[in-house]
């Protein structure tokens, strides 16, 4: 399947990958927020959250929501990529390097190969991409939990997070041509969505080092954990009116 004709890499990891990543994040948001907001919706919050033990159950619900979201995400990935590979079998190509000239696709007006920082074949690249998807799903679940701890309303949290993520994607397109670009790229999850399909390879000057995706996961994780712990601490001291 020459890339110039079939666009296997761009379709499998780019077009399809971006859609799946967006669906996974929304799915995890809904799963976590549904469980955490159950008491408020059912009007039993004054009975459950009145004690310290009752408040601690919310943390377990968040964990359950994240685990459920990860399972749903895995099933979504299995069904989507399974359907793709059933229609376009890659038997005999799994050990072909991603940077092979056969995989090259027309990009930026030229026929450019996908030169990765490490020598990975198609199978390894797919596995690394799936790991990235699940890691992002985990961070999305923690972010949803942090949002509920701070706002205590699933509808409001979903609205705020949707606007926030759309803003981060737009902010990722802004460049200052300074060192600040590197910091913003590492701490902005919107960059991971924009560069989906070109992970583990050089994209631009701000992402021209190996492991930039893992640095982005770490940086975003730190920024997400801060409001999570602050919101959780405030929730423990929260008194029902």
What are these model-predicted stretches?
Residues 39-46:
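Hydrophobic transmembrane alpha-helix segments characteristic of membrane transport
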Residues 48-55:
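Short helix-to-coil transition segments within interhelical loops
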Residues 154-168, 185-187:
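Central hydrophobic cores of alpha-helical transmembrane segments
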């Amino acid at each position: 399947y020459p890339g110039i004709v079939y666009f296997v890499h761009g379709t499998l990891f780019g077009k399809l990958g971006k859609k799946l990543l967006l669906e996974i994040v929304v799915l995890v948001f809904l799963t976590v927020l549904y469980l955490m907001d159950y008491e408020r919706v059912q009007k039993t919050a004054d009975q459950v959250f009145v004690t310290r033990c009752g408040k601690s159950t919310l943390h377990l619900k968040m964990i359950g929501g994240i685990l459920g979201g990860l399972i749903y995400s895995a099933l979504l990935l299995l069904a989507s990529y399974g359907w793709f590979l059933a229609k376009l079998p890659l038997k005999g190509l799994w050990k072909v390097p991603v940077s092979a000239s056969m995989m090259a696709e027309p990009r930026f007006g030229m026929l450019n190969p996908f030169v990765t920082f490490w020598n990975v074949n198609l199978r390894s690249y797919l596995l690394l991409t799936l790991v990235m998807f699940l890691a992002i799903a985990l961070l999305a679940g923690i972010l949803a939990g942090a949002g509920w701890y701070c706002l205590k309303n699933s509808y409001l949290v979903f609205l705020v997070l949707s606007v926030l993520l759309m803003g981060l994607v737009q902010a990722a397109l802004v460049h200052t041509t300074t060192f600040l670009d590197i910091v913003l790229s590492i701490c902005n999850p919107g960059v991971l969505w924009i560069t989906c399909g070109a992970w583990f390879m050089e994209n631009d000057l701000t992402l021209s080092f190996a492991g930039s995706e893992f640095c982005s996961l770490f940086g975003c994780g730190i920024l997400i954990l801060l409001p999570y712990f602050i919101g959780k601490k405030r929730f423990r001291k929260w008194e029902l009116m």
